[in-house]
Regions:
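Gram-negative bacterial Sec-dependent N-terminal signal peptides
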Residues: 1-21
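Extracytoplasmic/periplasmic ligand-capture domains
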Residues: 21-24, 65-67, 84-85, 92-130, ...
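Glycine-rich and polybasic anion-binding loops at the starts of cofactor/ligand-binding domains
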Residues: 532
Length: 567
């Protein structure tokens, strides 16, 4: 309780801290450290939050989400609505008026052509766009004039605020990326590492999986911002050293994703150099169960693809047994304390969308054993490991290097061992695991394992695009550079049909019911996604840094232009 009070008090003090700007660059260097290093500066080539945060300092969308979940215009004059004529009465078009006078960091004009091009870039079927679900249902994107963009949908769309809204869908400069369409997307190294943007900073040096160096954008539209002349974003550190670099040594101003044990949090707060800030949204630590065979005996290009169904997980009783064996409350108590809560939902928030899905919250070891018995998995030779038709019930369980995740792995392995499942644990450097490199065998998109654990979320308060990631067509595969969003390779035509129906549902109550049903279809009904904990965003902030406004619905750096040094 003391820790909770300290966290809330620190956040309140920070929220009311004064932020005054003398002139652009007057506060010297901003130093950010991430527990996971950035691998790219192009949000469209990565699903990793580490990359999306880093890129958001440079590239901007037409609109962003504020901490209260409401939208704010960024590169647009206003948010299009039915009332102001920006959204058509039939729900089939949305028209954005662009902010006049905006310059790219190279001094050229930002225009509607850049917006249209960005849509073409992501929707190219050969490009492997990691944010393709943000463009779901779009028929065409047109430049009406240099400052007006019209998006037309194939069917009436009740939530047209997806493409170009939030940190996942920024605008790319057409001039820089026009030769990077389709299969060329991932090979445009210069553009992907040093994008020309409209945001407050410009990349001057980028070392993948290590460090990014920025300078203030000389053409940023607010002449007084950013307050910092330069910024350094260092990565590759674990959560503990990231937190220490802010809270104990004071070497850094901001530490992203400081997942550390509750008792250590309290000790660091007592040092008096900083505070931890939290914000609850849709961030869920989960297990993903691979519905395809990841065996290394298969030819490269066929592993973890629909050509080969998983030999064990094709039986839902096995998947259910693995979930039943887990004590989620104990995981949260040991791993997160006040910074998380147990959940069975992929969509735990906002409350209006959260399913009454609580069946997984009580551990049921005997129920898990019974399910495996019914599925025909028994210990025929008495070695403690179940087998069936000569095959051992043996799984590879991978995740990123992180002390809490390794604790979770050890605990879950023991619970699974207790029900007769053999488990091999694998840990991967987070910069590689979340990096999206099509040439690496260790990315979470390739999923060369049976089970993997990570956390993911969506921007904004509407999970429409997030849930649309799990349609059949979005499974990662070699043809799209392994950039698909459907990580477990889940495929259910009924799910796909309900996604399509939801896109055109206007009634809020019916829409909420659809979201709950979609959530249940991938969790308790299919158990391909096994939620563990609804995590708060949890980062360390120096007492010398003001203006930070923790945001659960957008990039944590969504207002980095407003950050400054305490006077």
């Amino acid at each position: 309780m003391k820790l909770k009070t300290a966290l809330m008090g620190a956040a309140a003090l920070l929220a009311f801290a004064p932020a005054a700007f003398a002139e652009r660059g007057s506060d010297g260097e901003l130093k950010i450290i991430q527990s996971q290093a950035a691998s790219t500066m192009n949000q469209y080539l990565s699903s990793g939050t580490k990359d999306i945060n880093a890129s958001s300092m440079v590239s901007e969308p037409l609109a962003s989400y504020k901490p209260d979940g409401t939208m704010m215009p960024r590169l647009a004059v206003e948010i299009p609505t039915l009332e102001n004529g920006g959204v058509s009465a039939d729900g089939k078009t949305i028209t954005w008026k662009l902010l006049p006078g905006v310059k790219w960091s190279d001094g050229t004009d930002f225009t509607a052509d850049d917006v249209v091009f960005t849509g073409q870039y992501c929707m190219d079927p050969a490009g492997g766009c990691a944010q393709l679900s943000k463009f779901e249902g779009i028929d065409k994107i047109e430049a009406v004039d240099p400052l007006t963009v019209k998006i037309s949908f194939k069917e009436p769309k009740t939530n047209p605020y997806s493409a170009f809204v939030g940190a996942l869908a920024p605008i790319l400069q057409k001039k820089q990326f026009e030769k990077c369409l389709g299969a060329n997307a991932s090979s445009c190294t210069d553009a992907n590492f040093k994008p020309i943007g409209t945001g407050p900073f410009v990349v001057t040096d980028f070392k993948t999986n290590d460090v990014a160096v920025f300078v203030a954008n000389p053409n940023y539209r607010d002449p007084a911002k950013p307050a910092f002349a330069t910024a350094t974003l260092k990565g590759g550190n674990d959560a503990m050293s990231t937190a220490r670099a802010v809270m104990e040594t004071g070497e850094y101003d901001y530490g992203w994703n400081t997942q550390i044990e509750p008792e250590v949090q309290a000790q660091m707060i007592a040092a008096g150099k900083g505070k931890f800030m939290t914000a609850y949204g849709g961030l869920v630590e989960r297990l993903e169960l691979n519905m395809t065979d990841a065996s290394s005996a298969l030819p490269e290009g066929e592993r973890s693809t629909a050509k080969h169904p998983h030999p064990i997980f094709s039986d839902i009783r096995v998947r259910e047994a693995l979930s039943k064996a887990i004590d989620r409350s104990l995981l949260v108590e040991i791993g997160y304390g006040e910074a998380a809560r147990p959940t069975c939902n992929l969509v735990p928030a906002p409350e209006m969308f959260a399913s009454d899905n609580t069946g997984c919250l009580t551990q049921d070891v005997e129920g898990a054993k019974k399910l495996l018995d019914e599925a025909g998995w028994t210990d025929s030779d008495g070695d403690g490991i179940r087998d069936k038709d000569g095959k051992k019930l043996s799984l590879v369980y991978q995740t990123s290097v992180n002390p809490i995740r390794q604790n979770f792995q050890a605990m879950i392995k023991q619970w699974w061992n207790d029900i007769g499942v053999e488990v091999e644990l694998k840990q991967i450097d987070p910069s590689v695991f979340f990096g999206g490199d099509a040439g690496s065998p260790d990315t979470f998109q390739k999923f060369y394992a049976d089970v993997q654990m990570f956390a993911n979320e969506w921007d904004g308060t509407d999970p429409q695009a997030y849930l649309a990631q799990l349609t059949c067509e979005k499974a990662p595969k070699p043809e799209d550079q392994w950039q698909g969003e459907n990580i477990p390779r889940f495929c259910n035509p009924d799910y796909d049909a309900l996604i399509k129906e939801m896109l055109t549902t206007a009634d809020p109550a019916k829409r909420a019911d659809q979201i709950k049903k979609l959530n249940d279809m991938v969790t308790k009904d299919a158990m391909v996604t096994v939620p563990l904990a609804n995590r708060a965003r949890f980062s360390a902030v120096s007492n010398t840094l003001v203006g930070v406004d923790m945001n659960a619905w957008d990039s944590e750096y969504w207002n980095v232009a407003d950050w400054s040094r305490a006077k």
